[in-house]
């Protein structure tokens, strides 16, 4: 009776190997796709930003990667729709960052009402 068990174990091991190979292939394809998209994005940013503006964006990416990713996508969309002039200078990028900062700034006001006990 040990022969069928070893056969089942061999089948199971082969199935697991195939699944692992498929998963590895899928992950590799996904990594390649992401690298290709990142490469395309970088080439677009090289066209729409001056070197100084690209350096500022790189600095932002080091500190706030999620914000930088969102900003990159917004800049590309603005450039493609013609809403910003190309190439975008560092000063113009600073202005855009200030506008974003103002939009995101939240003023919290605490109101204290005096109520007398009557």
From Swiss-Prot:
Record's protein name: DNA-binding protein M1425_1752
One Pfam entry name: dsDNA_bind
SUPFAM superfamilies: Double-stranded DNA-binding domain
Organism whose genome encodes this protein: Saccharolobus islandicus (strain M.14.25 / Kamchatka #1) (Sulfolobus islandicus)
UniProt entry keywords in alphabetical sequence: DNA-binding
Any one of the GO CC terms: cytosol
Keyword DNA-binding: yes
Family: Belongs to the PDCD5 family.
GO molecular function, one term: DNA binding
Record InterPro entries: DNA_bind_arc, PDCD5-like, PDCD5-like_sf
Top-rank taxon: Archaea
């Amino acid at each position: 009776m040990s022969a069928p068990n070893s056969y089942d174990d061999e089948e199971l091991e082969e199935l697991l190997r195939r699944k692992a190979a498929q998963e590895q292939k899928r992950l590799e394809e996904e990594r390649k796709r992401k690298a290709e998209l990142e490469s395309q994005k970088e080439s677009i940013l090289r066209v729409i930003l001056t070197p100084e503006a690209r350096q500022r964006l790189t600095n932002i990416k080091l500190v706030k990667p999620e914000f930088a990713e969102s900003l990159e996508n917004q800049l590309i969309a603005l450039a493609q729709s013609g809403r910003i002039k190309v190439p975008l200078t560092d000063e113009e990028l600073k202005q855009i960052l200030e506008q974003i900062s103002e939009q995101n700034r939240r003023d919290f006001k605490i109101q204290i009402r005096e109520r007398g006990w009557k």
